[in-house]
C-alpha cells in the first residue's frame, strides 16, 4: 500500500473487514506447501501478512509454483524473470493467474493483481492458493507434492447408468412425497379462518 494514502470512514471499515479475513495459520500452511512444491531454494519468509505479500509480490514464487504443477517440459510459463521493475512483476502475477485458470481454478476463486501488488486483499490471495492446491490434489497426476490432507479434494462426477427394466420398476413404486390414501386424513379439520367450536 505504498502508493495509497490512509483510508477513512466507510472505506476504512471495509478495509478492516477485508483484513480480518486473513488467516495467519493458513499463511504458514501455504508457505510450507509452496516451498515443498517448488522443490527449489526458495527462502522461507518471516511470518506476517506484509512479509507474505513481499515474498509473493514479484511473481517469481507464484510462477515457479504453477510450473511445478506440470510435468517437465510442459510448464505454462517458460521464462520467469526476477526483474525489479513494477510492470514486469505485475505481468508475472497476471501470467500466474491466467495459468491457474487454465489449470482448473475457477474464475471466482482468482484474486486480482492489485489485491497482491498493493496488499489490498491478501485473504483473496490465500483463497486462490487454496483453490489451486485443491485442484492439484484432485487431479492426482503425480505432480502435487505435499500432504494430501492440506487441501480439500473437489467432488468428481459420478454418472449412474440404469437399464430399461430398472427404470420400469421405478415407475411402480409410490414415492413418499405422493402421500398415502391410508392413515391420517383431514376429516374433521376446519377451514382457515374459521373459529374452533368448543362445546
From Swiss-Prot:
UniProt modified residues of type Phosphoserine: 163
Region feature (Disordered): 178-199
Keyword Phosphoprotein recorded: yes
Gene Ontology terms: cellular component: myelin sheath; nucleus; synapse
Domain Calponin-homology (CH): 24-136
Similarity comment: family membership: Belongs to the calponin family.
Protein's name according to its UniProt entry: Transgelin-3
Organism lineage string: Eukaryota, Metazoa, Chordata, Craniata, Vertebrata
Amino acid at each position: 500500500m505504498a502508493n495509497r494514502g490512509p483510508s477513512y470512514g466507510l472505506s476504512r471499515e471495509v478495509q478492516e473487514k477485508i483484513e480480518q479475513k486473513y488467516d495467519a495459520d493458513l499463511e504458514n500452511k501455504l508457505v510450507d506447501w509452496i516451498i515443498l512444491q517448488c522443490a527449489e531454494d526458495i527462502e522461507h519468509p518471516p511470518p506476517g501478512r506484509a512479509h507474505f505479500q513481499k515474498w509473493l509480490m514479484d511473481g517469481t514464487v507464484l510462477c515457479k509454483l504453477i510450473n511445478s504443477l506440470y510435468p517437465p517440459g510442459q510448464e505454462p510459463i517458460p521464462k520467469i524473470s526476477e526483474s525489479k521493475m513494477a510492470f514486469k512483476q505485475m505481468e508475472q502475477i497476471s501470467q500466474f493467474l491466467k495459468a491457474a485458470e487454465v489449470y482448473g481454478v475457477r474464475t471466482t476463486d482468482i484474486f486480482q493483481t492489485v489485491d497482491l501488488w498493493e496488499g489490498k486483499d491478501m485473504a483473496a490471495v490465500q483463497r486462490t492458493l487454496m483453490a489451486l492446491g485443491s485442484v492439484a490434489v484432485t487431479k492426482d497426476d503425480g505432480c502435487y507434492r505435499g500432504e494430501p490432507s492440506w487441501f480439500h479434494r473437489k467432488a468428481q462426477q459420478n454418472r449412474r447408468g440404469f437399464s430399461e427394466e430398472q427404470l420400469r420398476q421405478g415407475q411402480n413404486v409410490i414415492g413418499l412425497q405422493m402421500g398415502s390414501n391410508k392413515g391420517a386424513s383431514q376429516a374433521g379439520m376446519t377451514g382457515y379462518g374459521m373459529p374452533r367450536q368448543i362445546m
